[in-house]
Design a protein with these regions (language model features):
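Bacterial N-terminal signal peptides that target proteins for export
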Residues: 1-11
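Bacterial N-terminal signal peptides
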Residues: 10-20
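Boundary at the C-terminal end of the N-terminal hydrophobic targeting segment
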Residues: 22-27
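N-terminal pre-domain segments of enzymes
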Residues: 28-99
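Short, intrinsically disordered, charge-balanced linker/junction segments flanking boundaries
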Residues: 39-45, 490, 508-520
């Protein structure tokens, strides 16, 4: 069901902080490695095959409640040893890799020590589905300087906290959220408000804009979805919010419209080249025959709609083709091209029946009507018939490494548990047609999840954790035979649906990388940390909040400036070092 469903890595700080992408014709992605690093060439390749695990509701055995670390008060006075960094969008960058390469305090050694633990819990007014975001060293209108933590809730509230003292700098309600009962879909309870991670565009030390989508119901059964541009310093709208209401003409006549009751902004927002991008999915596959998935583009300066792509072009039963990706954002390459994966829906390129269900789609920056490339699994019909969305997982671009002879690559995965490695520069339609094949297919566990990437001292590594499965690490071969090879695995499994891991490290320095993942249970959420090089047993594990339906939480932690933030039901739990 639908709701059950640049930085150039190691790049200059200013590019990472603004979330902007390099322009130009090339769609190759690059990151520099330190001189003593080696690419993953010549590694023996292997096929990794694991039986697909069925979807399951997992109840985690609660960990002993460690509560606040005894040194929590000391942590509030502890300065960050490195240069503070910003996290302005979902999963850190536009690929989106989930890698923060600017972390100096949190290492495998420090996280495993007795000095690491829970610092505090922030109480908020609703579900925290959106990843918290962080703006460091920001000058407020009164000229005071703060590291600002942004938290958005399902109750349509945005909080701005001082990320040292956790005093509330401001909070803002964007309206009355939509009632789950009125919407008619109870995947998320009790309300739908802000569900997608906002994106922040920072232009100066004292100037930043939060772009956020809020679903509201100001009167009974009066549904609205609006894009806001909010001043980070004051919490006020910088311009009139824009009603999200795209429409498109169909090849078969008539129009398709956005449905604010049965559709929502679940895919996180992204920013590139002056534009805000978002994906639109459906609630519980409701009103399936009358709605389409969308990728939308808005001018960041005016909030006006400047581009749209509807994933169906002909009216027919059970179309949908939602762009929801369990909260993962669209991916953007350095040329500004947009990549997404669609969910349940028909696939056809025949006029009068055209649709892009169960597909990776690549779109030009302006979202021109014709995709620049697509990939559709050969078994798309069985995926569609079995509610086994390809689009329950996100698309992640892999950075092009120095000396890489392989083409730019993309990984994607979904409920069927197949991880596809694709040539991102040559997406050529239906798998098997004309001999077209993925670069590699690896059978793993079902995914309501997303991958992460880290460029370590031995080269690129992809991290993936599916439903009830182990966290797995795959090295990336970048020679003429591109492939993924499993090189490590955790000793413990995931919760319901899998995880959205993130990686923190001090660049590619050996011994500094940690993989973080939220294990989703019902109702308990747990945060776990692993040595990125070896995985194995967790370095640290702790309860980090509850959720009314853990398999639907789709949570991603924020890791930056020596701290870890985990959103849950009406809380954000903060972890860090005390000395």
């Amino acid at each position: 069901m639908a709701a059950r469903r640049t930085i150039l890595l190691g790049l200059c700080a200013s590019l990472a902080l603004t979330g902007t992408l390099a322009t130009g014709a090339s769609a190759r992605l690059h990151y520099p490695l330190p001189p003593d690093s080696t690419a993953v060439n010549g590694v023996a390749q292997q096929k990794v095959s694991h039986a697909r695990m069925p979807a399951q509701e997992i109840r985690l055995a609660p960990l002993p409640d460690k509560g606040l670390h005894p040194g929590a008060a000391l942590w509030l006075k502890r300065p960050y040893a490195g240069t503070p960094t910003d996290v302005l969008r979902y999963h850190n960058d536009n690929y989106p890799t989930g890698w923060n390469p600017n972390e100096t305090d949190l290492t495998p050694a420090s996280v495993a020590s007795a000095s690491f633990g829970q610092i505090t819990t922030l109480n908020v007014d609703g579900n925290v589905m959106a990843e918290p975001l962080l703006v460091s060293n920001f000058q407020m209108p009164d000229n005071s300087t703060h590291d600002v933590l942004i938290v958005a809730t399902g109750h349509d509230t945005i909080y701005a906290y001082d990320a040292q003292t956790y005093a509330v700098l401001w909070q803002r309600s964007l309206g009355t959220p939509q009632s789950t009962g009125d919407v008619g879909c109870s995947d998320i309870k009790p309300e739908y408000g802000i569900s997608s991670t906002p994106v922040i565009v920072r232009s100066a030390q004292n100037a930043a804009t939060i772009y956020v989508v809020a679903a509201t119901e100001p009167a009974h059964l009066s549904f609205h979805t609006k894009l806001h541009a909010i001043d980070l310093g004051t919490g006020k709208d910088l311009m009139r919010p824009h009603e999200i209401a795209p429409a498109a003409s169909l090849e078969t006549g008539g129009k398709i419209h956005f449905d604010p009751q049965n559709q929502w902004s679940r895919s996180s927002l992204a920013y590139a080249n002056g534009a805000i991008y978002m994906g639109i999915g459906s609630h519980c596959d409701s009103n399936a025959g009358a709605i389409s998935g969308w990728v939308l583009r808005y001018d960041a300066a005016t909030l006006q709609l400047t581009g749209k792509f509807n994933t169906i072009e002909a009216a027919a039963g059970y179309e949908l083709s939602s762009v929801w990706m369990s909260g993962y954002s669209v991916a953007l390459d350095p040329a500004g091209n947009v990549y997404a994966i669609t969910g349940n829906g028909n696939y056809s390129l025949t006029k009068g029946h055209k649709g892009y269900g169960e597909s990776v789609i690549a779109l030009a920056p302006d979202l021109n009507r014709t995709p620049i490339g697509t990939f559709t699994p050969s078994n798309w019909q069985s995926l569609n018939n079995g509610d086994t969305d390809f689009g329950s997982g996100g698309a992640m671009l892999l950075p092009v490494a120095p000396g890489q002879t392989a083409p730019p690559m993309l990984v994607g995965m979904g409920k069927a548990g197949t991880m596809y490695l694709l040539d991102a520069s040559s997406l050529r339609g239906l798998e098997g047609q004309g001999g077209y094949q993925a670069l590699q297919k690896i059978q793993l566990s079902a995914c309501w999840c997303g991958a992460a990437y880290y460029a370590g001292p031995a080269g690129g590594v992809v991290y993936y954790q599916g439903n009830g499965d182990l966290l797995r690490a795959f090295s990336v071969a970048i020679d003429g035979t591109p492939s993924l090879t499993q090189v490590a695995a955790s000793s413990d499994g995931a919760g319901s649906g899998g995880a959205f891991p993130v990686v923190s490290s001090n660049g590619a320095t050996s011994g500094t990388a940690v993989v973080w993942a939220i294990e989703r249970g019902n109702p308990t959420e747990q945060i776990k940390a692993y040595n990125a090089a070896t995985l194995g047993a967790p370095l640290f594990a702790a309860n980090a909040g509850n959720w009314s339906n853990g398999s639907r939480s789709y949570l991603t932690p924020l890791v930056a400036n020596g701290r870890v933030y985990v959103g849950a039901f009406k809380t954000v739990t903060v972890f860090g070092l005390t000395n």
